[in-house]
Amino acid sequence: MLEPEYLEKFSDQLLALVDALSTAIIADMSKRLVKTGEITETSRRQAEILQGAGLLYKDVLKRVSQVSGYMNTEVERVFEEAGVRNLKNEAVIYKAAGEKEIKLHQSETMQKILAANVRKTKEEINNLTLTTAVKTQSAYITACNKAMMKVQTGAFSYDKAIADAIKEAAVQGTEVLYPSGHVDKLDVAVRRAVLTGVNQSAAEMNLQYVKESGCDHVETTAHSGARPTHAVWQGKVFCVSGKDSRYPPFYESTGYGTGAGLCGWNCRHNFHAFFPGISAPAYSQEMLDDYSARKYEYNGKKYTEYELSQMQRSQERKIRATKRKLTGYDAGIKNTDSNTLKAELTNRFESESAELKKQEKSLKKFCRQTGRRYESARTQVHAVLDSEGNIVGFNKSVAQKAVWASKRHTSKMQMVK
């Protein structure tokens, strides 16, 4: 069994790597945008845009290759960690019932289950990540064409049009393309893949444990903030075979094995062995009712844990979007030869830095008032590049620049007043 709290945070380091890849790709796109130059002839402009798009496509593939090794290693690590943790948690229940303990490194069957899920998840993440090259190339062409139209109509100067293009590309972020045609943000896709993969791996291990021990009952985990369709079966005992009429059937009741059910897409519920007459239920009805109660107050209103979690995620997404814009502006400042464009981008960088400070202050206040934990792991990581522009590590350089830029912006505003 894997605890919901563990499943919420176990992939943070992997997602930090994904965020670093995203910001590196945005920086590459920004570099290409500021190098386009002012060409008024449409045919020449289109030729240059397509050439830049081709080079950017290669840039993205290079970035993916630089980070994929880190990501694959991290995927292997989290699966191994989760597998050991899962079986240790199960062992406590089995030993209490007089059953033998199964350890991951002593069970060939459990190791095969883990290895198969690691392989499947790595392939899914690698395939999805590669599609970012196509989506980024498309976003670049769209951004260039919009900038060209703005300049040609006389509505915007070249500098403002390019700065807008960088902003739009950064806000859109890196996206992946599923075979079905569905488009998602890269970090969302990776989180879904690794959470689902790890949880399903643990679930398969637990069912194998049940099979080997002869246990026929399981209890699902429960957590506050569960989606309504999952809240109806969380924290309850089920019969795996469906033969014990005292308990509802496991598969039919929880939807296990389907994307929308237990251990499906983005699900943080798991389950553990339960021995009637020996095991004590982990959750009382009072506890389950409390999980879905509107007991949290914020700005004079009552909210459930689920509602607060969605509010926090929304604020965190805005912070990441702002940091992507800062990355784009920063790359543009470093790579443009135009003093006027550099001035435009610098002004925007300072203004956006002040906005970032407000957003982070607002999120900290929200977490303080609602008793939630302020998550900063993902918002602090950025790629470190060597002299040739290759990703060789991670640091907080852009974040620190934003702090100083925010101070400069505040000073300017005070002078205006």
Task: List each language-model region with its residue ranges.
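Acidic, glycine-rich two-metal-ion catalytic cores of nucleic acid-processing enzymes
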Residues: 184-288
